[in-house]
Amino acid sequence: MATGGGAEEESQRGRPQLPLPARPVARVEEPEGVREKMGWAQVVKNLAEKKGDFREPRRRDETGSGASGGLGSPGGLATPNPGDFPPAARGDPKGRRRDPTGEASDAYRKKSASGAGDPSRRKKAEVTAAMATPARPGTTEDATERPLQDEPPAAGPGKGRFLVRICFQGDESACPTRDFVVGALILRSIGMDPDDIYAVIQIPGSREFDVSFRSAEKLALFLRVYEEKRELEDCWENFVVLGRSRSSLKTLFILFRNETVDVEDIVTWLKRHCDVLAVPVKVTDRFGIWTGEYKCEIELRQGEGGVRHLPGAFFLGAERGYSWYKGQPKTCFKCGSRTHMSGTCTQDRCFRCGEEGHLSPYCRKVIVCNLCGKRGHAFAQCPKAVHNSVTAQLTSVAGH
């Protein structure tokens, strides 16, 4: 049956139709059966008036495909893209796929409206929406790398800070990375364990690396090995260790003419004057032969006048020992003065009681042990001496 609009329809098909601008019009109920009699151009015109210009700008590849002309499309009109139309609602007979983001947000809005007064339902809806919403590109983050909100902070190494600063003194452009300092210098060359280190901090662009240790013993170990390795291994070239945490940390050397002095007695004497951070070790020469020296890491104590230094010479029993470390002042063995040495000293000092003013043969005072520092006994009878402790153990074993 002729519709009366055939000529107009044919003329409209011959040239592309542009959507008309949207303008507000009153919605008029169309009588049933009128849509079947309208032509293609009239249908497009009515849709443009009711919906507005709902088409999105086509992408470059879509424009090219439309220009070439697809099969089944009217001449001069581009093939409609399903993405140009709004997503279908639930129950849509055409069965278009919906955006999961839109579904999640719709569910969240509906549940929020229905359960606004129920906090548990609202929280559950938020979790459901978050799980259904896909992550944006570039924002995917490994869960293991994201810090936990409730994780307690790491425990510090103690009240004090045990720091060294490793400085690179070469060309700035050749400054190694933090991984090199940690892996090559601290872990491999020094032989430290990762658990011994509290933190290694480098300010971006800086050539300084602050290393914090968990204890004074680990710091002393680092310093001792560093002194041995810095001249032997090329990895320490252009590196220097500065800014030690405490000026009272020292590497002490002790020497006796008698090599039979027990190292435990040396430690007992040292603990009277300083804090021993590591057990003394023997010093050997280039042939591997012991020189008679002991070396250990100590921390000097603070006194009323500042740092309390160790004497340069002392006695353990009848054996005379010598001590030295960097920064140790030279003092007179008799009176402790820094203005002269014992060879020119005119002061008398008793080595029996440790007081000045008289010599040992004329001493009438109570003897003082030069090992433990207590009165009433000499080194030979000192209960802290190794020879007495061993004798006591053997005596107790023989008695049973």
From Swiss-Prot:
S-S bonds: none
PTM sites of type Phosphotyrosine: Y198
Effect of gene knockout: Mice were born at the Mendelian ratio and do not show defects in development and immune cell differentiation. Mice are however more susceptible to DNA and RNA virus infection.
Entry's Gene Ontology cellular component terms: cytoplasm
Subcellular location(s) per record: Cytoplasm
Main location class: cytoplasm
Basic and acidic residues bias spans: 26-38, 47-63, 91-109
This protein's UniProt keywords: Antiviral defense, Cytoplasm, DNA-binding, Immunity, Innate immunity, Metal-binding, Phosphoprotein, Repeat, RNA-binding, Zinc, Zinc-finger
Record's protein name: Zinc finger CCHC domain-containing protein 3
Source organism: Mus musculus
Gene: Zcchc3
